[in-house]
């Protein structure tokens, strides 16, 4: 999971 300096939001990467 590529976690950048962004808030914990439901992204496509998180759905995987």
Curated annotation (Swiss-Prot):
Gene induction: Repressed by acid stress.
Keyword Iron: yes
Listed GO MF terms: metal ion binding; superoxide dismutase activity
UniProt EC number: 1.15.1.1
Cofactor binding annotation: Binds 1 Mn(2+) or Fe(2+) ion per subunit.
Keywords assigned by UniProt, alphabetized: Iron, Manganese, Metal-binding, Oxidoreductase
Membrane listed as a keyword: no
Catalytic activity, as annotated: 2 superoxide + 2 H(+) = H2O2 + O2
Cofactor: Mn(2+); Fe(2+)
Disulfide bond sites: none
Subunit structure: Homodimer.
The family this protein is said to belong to: Belongs to the iron/manganese superoxide dismutase family.
Role: Destroys superoxide anion radicals which are normally produced within the cells and which are toxic to biological systems.
Protein's recorded name: Superoxide dismutase [Mn/Fe]
Species in which this protein is naturally found: Bacillus cereus
